[in-house]
Regions:
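P-loop NTPase catalytic phosphate-binding loop
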Residues: 1, 16-17, 24-160, 178-220
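N-terminal accessory nucleic-acid engagement/regulatory domains that precede
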Residues: 1-11
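Short glycine-rich substrate-engagement loop in P-loop NTPases that contacts/grips substrate
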Residues: 154-172
Length: 220
């Protein structure tokens, strides 16, 4: 191949192939959890480009940023992308560093991808579906309560260390250094079928946007 040749994207490229692994054990998940530092980067591979090189998404504040929107026509693979991204984050970061709430407006199919019997992905701390309408309001109360809890913990850490301000990155570094004892992970709120949620639950969406705005420095 000469230098101008392009890599031919395969029709099917598995998650393990993206990590150059043949078996799950070869992902070396525990080693990744120990070595990857969520205070410096939150990068996770999500695919390959036309040169065969990894495409990486990094939602760290100093990289791509914490908010994002996936757009595509019906059947274009938006849900598959979300599954890939969630798994990639889980492979690279300990549940003490990254956790997730799933808002699944496809009837629970997304959440089901991360659970087999009684075994589920430890990073997923909550699931909201369009089947459980009453659960929407309960979940919002829980998220707002978590924001207040984080504010209290960050203030306690600030007083303990005499820091001027504490954000999620500083707090996690204090935890990794053993200065504070309770882990507080980044909490990602991931919504599948965002447009459907916005149309059916506009008040919930307004509150969710407010949570995202207020919660940025708190890791939400």
């Amino acid at each position: 191949l000469n230098s101008t040749s392009k890599f031919a994207l395969p029709e099917v490229y598995t998650f393990l192939e993206m990590y150059d692994a043949g078996r799950i054990e070869q992902l070396n998940i525990l080693q990744r959890w120990m070595t990857n530092d969520s205070t410096k980067s939150l990068q996770a591979p999500i695919g390959i480009d036309t040169n065969g090189m990894p495409i990486v998404l990094d939602i760290h504040e100093k990289a791509h940023g914490p908010h994002g929107l996936i757009a595509g026509s019906t059947g274009s693979g938006k849900s598959e992308f979300i599954i890939t991204y969630i798994l990639s984050l889980a492979v690279n970061y300990h549940p003490n560093d990254v956790s997730m709430i799933l808002i699944d407006y496809k009837g629970g199919g997304l959440a089901g991808a991360f659970q087999k019997g009684d075994v589920k992905l430890p990073h997923i701390v909550g699931t909201i579906t369009n089947i459980d309408k009453a659960g929407l309001q309960r979940s919002l109360v829980s998220i707002q309560s978590e924001l207040r809890r984080r504010q209290v913990k960050f203030n306690q850490a600030r007083e303990k260390t005499d820091e001027g301000t504490i954000d999620i990155y500083k707090y996690q570094k204090l935890y990794h250094d053993g200065i504070v004892k309770e882990p507080i992970p980044h909490l990602l709120i991931i919504c599948d079928e965002f447009a459907e949620l916005k149309q059916q639950q506009p008040d919930f969406m307004d509150e969710l946007i407010s949570v995202a705005r207020i919660g940025r420095s708190l890791g939400v």
